[in-house]
A protein has these predicted regions:
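Bacterial signal peptide processing site
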Residues: 7-10
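Short, internal strand/loop/helix patches
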Residues: 103-148
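C-terminal motif of bacterial Sec signal peptides marking the signal peptidase cleavage site
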Residues: 2-5
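Typically the conserved alpha-helix immediately C-terminal to a functionally engaged Cys/Sec
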Residues: 63-78, 99
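Thiol-/selenol-based redox modules, centered on thioredoxin-like
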Residues: 140-185
């Protein structure tokens, strides 16, 4: 499943939303992930929440700090009473980004609340999930990756509903989409 568009801000699905899990849901993916606390989970464990996801690596010195800042900006702009929204940062460098490293990164970036989840998995699972998000990445040196800069929004049944592409872009539409999806939850 790859969702692509030429627009810089793209709507991936305008299909009717139901409480059942559609074939387009990430909750069907069998891959196992480990969070920053060392707990193993699957995507389906996040069912019922609006997910705001981005793929990064913690040793990145260029795009990832901006993506992290964009995620924090989006989170800070949500009304305080917004419920069932989880911000998920997925590592594209699972060899370096151990659960301990992810936890330290979360602390360094003031992303320690329950709404923040950091995940890592095998290279195969990471590549599969990157394909779902239409995120491309390639190791260009022992310590560096070239990668897409996309923040994805999933509804509470795991369907991709919106993507923000680029760094430091106006996040108004992203914030609005998250609020709309959270109100449906």
């Amino acid at each position: 499943m790859i969702f692509q568009s030429c627009d810089s801000n793209k709507k991936a699905s305008d299909a009717p939303k139901s409480k059942s899990i559609s074939d387009l849901s990430i909750y069907h993916l069998p891959s196992k992930w480990t969070n920053q606390d060392g707990k193993d989970i699957q995507m389906k464990n996040m069912k019922g929440k609006v997910l705001v996801m981005v793929m990064i690596y913690t040793s990145c010195k260029s795009a990832c700090p901006r993506l992290v800042a964009d995620m924090r900006n989006i989170e800070s702009r949500l009304p305080k009473d917004t419920k069932n929204v989880e911000f998920v940062l997925i590592s594209i460098d699972p060899k370096v980004d151990t659960p301990e490293r992810l936890k330290a990164f979360a602390k360094e970036n003031q992303m320690e609340g329950d709404q923040w989840t950091f995940l890592r998995s095998s290279e195969d699972n990471t590549r599969e999930f990157a394909a779902v998000l239409a995120v491309n990445y390639k190791k260009i040196s022992p310590m560096d990756f070239s990668h897409s800069n996309i923040i994805s929004v999933f509804n509470n049944v795991g369907e991709l509903t919106y993507q923000q592409e680029g760094l430091n872009v106006n996040a108004d539409e992203t914030v609005q989409k998250i609020i709309e999806e959270a109100q449906k939850s």
